[in-house]
Amino acid sequence: MDLAAARQRVEELRRLIEEHNYRYYVLDQPSISDREYDALMQELIALEEAYPELRTPDSPSQRVGGAPREEFNQVRHPQVLLSLNDAFNEGDLLEFDRRVRDLAGRPVEYVIEAKIDGLAVALTYRDGLFTLGATRGDGQVGEEVTANLKTIPALPLRLRRPLPFLVVRGEVYMPKVAFTALNAAREEAGEPLFANPRNAAAGSLRQLDPKITASRSLSLFVYQVISLTGAEVATQAGALDFLAELGFPVNPYRVVAPDIQAVLEEVKAWTPERRASLPYEIDGLVIKVNDLALHSVLGATAKAPRWAMAYKFPAEQATARVEGIILRVGRTGVLTPTAVLTPVRLAGTTVSRATLHNEDYIREKDIRIGDTVIVQKAGDIIPEVVAVIPERRTGSEEVFTMPERCPACGAAVVRPPGEAAHRCTGGLACPAQVLEGIIHFASRGAMDIQGLGPAIVAQLLEAGLIHDAADLYYLKEEDLLKLERFGQQSASNLLAAIAASKKQPLERLIFALGIRNVGQRAARVLADHFGSLDKLAAATVEELTALPDIGPRIAENIREFFGEPRNRAVLEKLKKAGVRLEALNAAAPAGPLTGKVFVLTGTLPGMTRQEAEELITRAGGKVSSSVSRKTDYVVAGEKPGSKLDRARELGVPVINADGLRQLLRQ
């Protein structure tokens, strides 16, 4: 393919991918499968790698990339991003309406919108291209998070209609499903949990490494035009329609209310059940004057506009009695305590269980069996015990202690130093760990075996048809037909999905194995470096820790995993079953920087961080986020950070952008 043909195909692929992004994330009407979408993206990436001159900042391939940053730059907003005054009851809303009508001198129409519980951001577009994204901060100054925002698939990198200049305001949020999955993964790893989706969204967007942000499944709703050149909007309802036409994700809930009485009726219609049914968290409603011309008439205080008010939902809490505390054993052996409660209605559902996270949480709140406690849904999702009512105690309450033996297999339970979690040491001899491990192996982010959910895995284990993940590849149709709810078609579909998973990339297999602390990013690093499972299994701790982002703890976990005879037996069965154990690019040619580890710091003249990282990796080098004795070069640009000081302390060679170019030419 020559350059002209490549350019034409790249433009076509970009148009197709952005159209599918719009249909999926904005319209919620996907028209192709995930596999078809991935094929388009991989073709685009391959063409841009073959023809680097065709790569542009607004290409869909550029959503994820760039080296980790040392700190965020401060950005002054061109217009102050005010917060909102809160209303907690009908009287507050009536008083708001009275003030608005007094200042306006006439009846006023309102728009009611959902108050998304996330992190406010300002997005700037020039000539239709996304050029700058910043957090709200204190309203006047925020943090520049452009690279991180680009990783959110719902955010358009190019508007569907080019405008000279546009600044909009939106809310980055984490869907409930993503929040539950993130906390489950953190709990398994013994890491602190996020209290609610809002904290998770804020913490994920403010990661110095955009790749971590990309892994957190963030989404976005845009709800306000701050500054606009090249078009006009007259009402807030019209502004929302205008934003949707430009390709922004706009929340589907919107009600135009002719007066405050209609607003009050709509507020009453928001039952706990309705709120709980949403796939994302809202903590209230926002009532805005619809006529934008009135906004300047009404003005603002130093803190908030006079033309809007946030109605906050009352907290959803209930009291319940702790009937008992049970333990769930996860795939890595983490024991998670759960309170068994007297059933109570909360946020539209009946709650009879609540997470207690770990022993430290139980001790901190002094939760005992028999206590009367206050329960709430953290982010309307996970019920948790937030407080004990000590005056309800009778003296018969029991203090809970973590067991010395695993309730599932009887193996010893230990609490590793520096971790909040207690772990079962039974490994693959523990049936609970085997169950959770196979569920993880088949999950979407791992081997992606469609149709193999937790219930079917449990069924297969109970029937003795499988004992580990590798046994899945030896199942026969007659085995499945013996099970309940399995017919000819469902058995055939599952076996086809299992067979298809044999061709998954090596990085997915490494992640699927469930090695402690080896997430998707670490799995990718390991697959890229070693190229095969056999080479990874033979790697020493020293070889592993020489890799970017593989620390001593992960290295020890990898060695421990491959040193376990049961795990080696599983790997042998996978190999015999025909599961791909090698990377497709295992024989990639060496380059001038092969084996060299680089760290980037400061602003590099003539190239972006992302471009520098790509040049290094294409030449066979590795880019790390931190300086160590294993770092070969630190590439320092303007205004370098603490990494330069660390390099000097360790005697690591420091070069500039020209020095990097010279190495690349060797």
From Swiss-Prot:
Amino-acid positions noted as binding NAD(+) in the UniProt annotation, renumbered to this chain? 34-38, 83-84, 113, 136, 171, 288, 312
Enzyme Commission number, as recorded: 6.5.1.2
Q: What class of enzyme is it?
A: ligase
Keywords assigned? DNA damage, DNA repair, DNA replication, Ligase, Magnesium, Manganese, Metal-binding, NAD, Zinc
Which part of the chain is the BRCT domain? 588-666
Stretches assigned to coiled coil = none
For this protein, the record's Pfam families field holds: BRCT, DNA_ligase_aden, DNA_ligase_OB, DNA_ligase_ZBD, HHH_2, HHH_5, Nlig-Ia
Where in the sequence is the active site?
115 (n6-amp-lysine intermediate)
Membrane spanning stretches: none
Q: Which GO terms describe its molecular function?
A: DNA binding; DNA ligase (NAD+) activity; metal ion binding
Known catalysed reaction(s)?
Answer: NAD(+) + (deoxyribonucleotide)n-3'-hydroxyl + 5'-phospho-(deoxyribonucleotide)m = (deoxyribonucleotide)n+m + AMP + beta-nicotinamide D-nucleotide
Domain of life the protein comes from: Bacteria
One GO BP on record is:
DNA replication
Query: What GO cellular component term, any one, is given?
Result: cytosol
List the InterPro entries hit by this protein, alphabetically: BRCT_dom, BRCT_dom_sf, DisA/LigA_HHH, DNA_ligase, DNA_ligase_AS, DNA_ligase_CS, DNAligase_adenylation, DNAligase_N
* Binding residues for Zn(2+): 406, 409, 424, 430
Q: Name the cofactor(s) required for activity, per the record.
A: Mg(2+); Mn(2+)
Family, as annotated: Belongs to the NAD-dependent DNA ligase family. LigA subfamily.
Main role? DNA ligase that catalyzes the formation of phosphodiester linkages between 5'-phosphoryl and 3'-hydroxyl groups in double-stranded DNA using NAD as a coenzyme and as the energy source for the reaction. It is essential for DNA replication and repair of damaged DNA.
Name by which UniProt lists this protein:
DNA ligase
Species per Swiss-Prot/TrEMBL record: Moorella thermoacetica (strain ATCC 39073 / JCM 9320)
From the broadest rank down, the organism's phylogenetic lineage runs:
Bacteria, Bacillati, Bacillota, Clostridia, Moorellales
